[in-house]
């Protein structure tokens, strides 16, 4: 199966970066808290979980694949497998998140690894 996965091509994505920016607004915090409960005052520290709502890439509908993600081959390598799965994260915060803060999210492809699973078949891990 390794011959069918162009791992050398996929590994050329290593080092590729995606930069997204956003501003933490009071309205975003309000919507976040309405979803998960709680309330955060303006200019107070906000829960770290809100980072999942920040600096999301935008893609027009025509640029989305069947799975709802942007087509593979842009920031993410074009892995020729039918499904994607999030496995884990390593996230760094350089300062406390507060309402009004301009944030930048930098995602970097650190590695692309092929594995063969007895249960699932071929897997490609893209370490971002």
Q: What is the role of each PLM region?
A:
Residues 1-102:
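Hydrophobic, proline/glycine-rich low-complexity stretches
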Residues 84-128:
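Hydrophobic beta-sheet segments that form the core/acyl-binding groove
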